[in-house]
Design a protein with these regions (language model features):
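Generic low-complexity segments that are intrinsically disordered, proline-rich and/or Lys/Arg-biased
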Residues: 296, 306-308
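Eukaryotic protein kinase
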Residues: 1-298
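Hydrophobic single-pass membrane-targeting/anchoring helices
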Residues: 310-312
Length: 312
């Protein structure tokens, strides 16, 4: 059986890598990270998938396995246009794994690093798509906990959010209980730094990522984890250059008080309502679909695919 062309960022398998993860035939690596390895594989339907396999040190933690199974089961039920769905999973395997479709396109982080800020209309698509995805995730009872530019793929048919819920499983392990903190410093909310987290933390990350998308720089700057923590806890974000229609929702999303932030559904509504081309009375999902068709058709945001990691 002829396989479709391989992903351009596929690298050769190592001697210890599996060649089959039923029902997927493994053809190479897409990337690796702290939590595991991402393999490029072909499913029974002939389509490419990204199969994310947990590292042994996590797989050996009973509490991690329990939470991982729970989170993946929830992820499998979430469906939204701007989410990469779970195709299959085996959380009882010696090394637990789950698979999502392989999505061609750069990550949001790679695209901004290579090309700078997105055009205002494209930034609005990313803002709306991420808000729609986060709202669907929260409606299913899941909190992403590690939203960052590496977890958003700018696919030809719109932005896609990856890997929601997995950071919660990692938080359960001895590897993090001994002092580590799961998350990415530039996108973490004040309460995450204080050791608590809920849906409001995802809203904060949305605000930081939309600002990054539209201005080309993180709203709390660059630097080490301690520097970023201080700025996020004590200083106001730099939102200079943010398009006017995104100023109000982003400012509210970045409020240091989680109780003062809007929900993801409210953010979606505000971004959708700001679309001057939206038909009167159209619902938010219809408006997002229209934004993607008008400003994203055929992969309007271009860039080379970046390596994927199991914790990106």
């Amino acid at each position: 059986m002829a396989h479709p062309p391989p992903p351009p960022n596929l690298t050769p398998l190592q001697s210890s890598d599996p060649r089959v993860i039923p029902p997927f035939a493994v053809h190479g690596r897409l990337g690796a990270g702290g939590m595991g390895v991402v393999y490029g594989a072909v499913g029974p339907d002939g389509r490419w998938a990204a199969v994310k396999v947990v590292r042994p040190e996590y797989a050996g933690e009973p509490e991690f396995r329990s939470r991982f199974a729970s989170e993946v089961a929830l992820m499998h039920r979430v469906r939204a246009r701007c989410i990469a769905p779970v195709l299959a999973h085996d959380t009882r395997a010696e090394l637990p794994w789950y698979a999502t479709p392989y999505l061609p396109g750069p990550t949001l982080g790679a695209r901004v690093r290579q090309g700078g800020a997105l055009a205002p209309h494209q930034a609005r698509v990313v803002a709306a798509g991420m808000a729609e995805a986060i709202a669907a995730i929260h409606a299913a009872g899941v909190v992403h906990r590690d939203l960052k530019p590496a977890n958003v793929i700018l696919a030809p048919d719109g932005p896609k959010v990856l890997d929601f819920g997995i950071a919660r499983a990692a938080d359960a392990t001895a590897l993090t209980r001994t002092g580590g903190l799961v998350g990415s410093p530039a996108w973490m909310s004040p309460e995450r730094y204080r050791g608590t987290s809920g849906p409001e933390a995802d809203v904060f990350a949305w605000g930081a990522m939309v600002a990054y998308t539209a201005t080309g720089r993180p709203p709390f700057g660059d630097g080490g984890a301690e520097t970023l923590m201080y700025r996020i806890l004590r200083e106001e974000p730099d939102l200079e250059g943010l398009p006017p229609e995104l100023e109000e929702p982003v400012t509210r999303a970045l409020d240091k008080d989680p109780a003062s932030r809007p929900s993801a559904g409210e953010l979606l509504h505000r971004v959708a309502a700001a679309d001057p081309e939206a038909a009167a009375g159209a619902d938010d999902t219809t408006i997002v679909d229209g934004l993607i068709r008008a400003h994203w058709a055929g992969g309007a945001v271009r860039g080379a695919p970046a390596p994927r990691t199991a914790d990106d």
